[in-house]
Amino acid sequence: MNAVTPTLPAPIGLLAELTHRCPLRCPYCSNPLELDKRSAELDTATWQRVLAEAAALGVLHIHLSGGEPTARQDIVEITRTCADLGLYSNLITSGVGAALGKLEALYDAGLDHVQLSFQSAEAGNAERIGGLKNAQAQKFAFAERVVALGLPLTLNAVIHRGNIDEVPTLIDLAVTLGAKRLEVAHTQYYGWAYVNRAALMPAKADVDRSIRVVEEARERLKGRLVIDLVVPDYYAKYPKACAGGWGRRLMNVTPAGKVLPCHAAETIPGLEFWNVQDHALADIWAHSPAFQAYRGTSWMKEPCRSCDRREKDWGGCRCQALALAGDAAATDPACSLSPLHAKIQALAIAESALEIAPDYQYRTIGGAPAVPQPEGASA
């Protein structure tokens, strides 16, 4: 008897990377090393068509991101299109530059939610990490206005060696600013973070302590603040399901219109990414070679293929497998069943123990930095 092919579920969310332009230069940015220039960005009408196709496909949430999405002159128009289509819009912003000046217009256009990044709870450290002076004062003013308008506010804090001691202070900051949710997201080492890994990697003892702080705060602040925690892969026992599983829940549209299964997928050579300027979104979701490549479980090698967790973590991260093992189809080295797992943990311990961390290689458009070689490329 032939096996029945399961119906492909619709994606839940779409990450709309409207631009790679950003006033911050964070060394852990998940954007690609080769950033799209302004001249390559999709125009307003194309984004509106993409949003309409997303709604028809069944997408519920649109994450308006970048770079800094408010750098787009048409961000209000794009947000209004989301509202007109019944799409829940989430603005992922640095809160600096043009963000505050456009906030009320975004609110009037129907914006549903704001996610505001904080590089540090301390102004000087925030400037050092983000590479922008006077950023903190702009963020405070932006957060205050978001709450005054009645918009739900989530703070996002990417945690690494340079700010891991501030987790308690960042939790207090979220409460003080009136946020409903805080994301304590340990750095995921893709994009610029992979280049800066040795400068960003925290000690395992510090990671464990930060997790205990979050767990205590969750109990203490129950009903006041929801705290999400993303733990670092290099110290994990099992990998996370990348983007909820490759090609299962999310899709990412780049500023130039490429549609990716995850934001780092372009690091995998040989994948064919379809563009919204050439294909309808539904066609891309169902038939794009890039989405098909690692969707489901048939592509898996052992030990993933026979693992009881194969439909929980879906093999972990393909981009991380490539970066660390030299093979995108390999077991994610974050998994304890990977032959590289112990080596990767030892690498993290060694980098975190550096007495003086290397200088940051800041995110910039034009001229990608040198990329570390895969740990397992010659294994």
UniProtKB/Swiss-Prot annotation:
Q: Where does [4Fe-4S] cluster bind?
A: 22, 26, 29
Among CDD domains, the record links this protein to: Radical_SAM (cd01335), SPASM_PqqE (cd21119)
**Location of the Radical SAM core domain:** 8-220
Query: Which keywords describe this protein according to UniProt?
Result: 4Fe-4S, Iron, Iron-sulfur, Metal-binding, Oxidoreductase, PQQ biosynthesis, S-adenosyl-L-methionine
What PROSITE patterns does the record point to?
MOAA_NIFB_PQQE, RADICAL_SAM
Which InterPro entries does its entry note?
4Fe4S-binding_SPASM_dom (IPR023885), Aldolase_TIM (IPR013785), MoaA_NifB_PqqE_Fe-S-bd_CS (IPR000385), PQQ_synth_PqqE_bac (IPR011843), PqqE-like (IPR017200), Radical_SAM_PqqE_MftC-like (IPR050377), rSAM (IPR007197)
Q: Please give the superkingdom of this protein's source.
A: Bacteria
The first-level EC class reads: oxidoreductase
Establish whether keyword S-adenosyl-L-methionine is in the entry: yes
For this protein, the Enzyme Commission number is: 1.21.98.4
Which Gene Ontology terms describe the biological processes this protein takes part in? pyrroloquinoline quinone biosynthetic process
Q: A Pfam family this protein belongs to?
A: Radical_SAM
Catalytic activities: [PQQ precursor protein] + S-adenosyl-L-methionine = E-Y cross-linked-[PQQ precursor protein] + 5'-deoxyadenosine + L-methionine + H(+)
Functional pathway:
Cofactor biosynthesis; pyrroloquinoline quinone biosynthesis
Q: How is the cofactor bound?
A: Binds 1 [4Fe-4S] cluster. The cluster is coordinated with 3 cysteines and an exchangeable S-adenosyl-L-methionine.
Q: PANTHER family in the record, alphabetically?
A: PQQA PEPTIDE CYCLASE (PTHR11228:SF7), RADICAL SAM DOMAIN PROTEIN (PTHR11228)
Self-association or partners: how does it assemble?
Interacts with PqqD. The interaction is necessary for activity of PqqE.
Protein family: Belongs to the radical SAM superfamily. PqqE family.
Q: Which HAMAP family match?
A: PqqE
Full protein name: PqqA peptide cyclase
Q: Which organism is it from?
A: Methylobacterium nodulans (strain LMG 21967 / CNCM I-2342 / ORS 2060)
Name the lineage: Bacteria, Pseudomonadati, Pseudomonadota, Alphaproteobacteria, Hyphomicrobiales
